[in-house]
Amino acid sequence: MRASITIDGLQDLQQEFERLENPRQRKASARRALRNAAKPLAALASSMAPRASGSLAASIGYGTRLSKRQAGIHRKMFRDDRVAVEMFVGASYAMGGGGRHAHLQEFGTGPRYHKSGKYVGQVSPQPFLRPAWDSYQATMLDTIKAELWADIQKSVARAERRAARLAAKNVAP
């Protein structure tokens, strides 16, 4: 699934962002803002997850890395997009056994039958991640904007202090 979000009125933020000369500083600022915005989304999804054994809720997290298989699929989907920073929220195999069946809980399964024709049941959908995203999306965008603004201000101030310190060091005999 591909989503496109347009945010209006961020020219001031863009101008401040361009004041960061080093691309690594820009990426680090964006990564920190996304991480701080992703934490509450992961917590909300975890609280909405079905609690049969509790392992599904424990497996929900956030991060910048995907599994090898997911990374290959992601590269194919977004081959032409050159995004500077990405953050992913969802169930992880590495964080608990519940991550392996998260998609089945979220979307459900159709009716299942043995080869003999005997009906063995189905899993009805119990969505937890999509409702969490739907309820937190607007707040998340505001959080990203506020976090980016604060982090950029700190980074610019730090760079200005560093430049002043170097200038004072070069002027002094």
Feature annotation, model-predicted:
Residues 1-84, 107-173:
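Short, Lys/Arg-rich flexible segments
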Residues 74-103:
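Mid-chain, well-packed structural core segment of small domains
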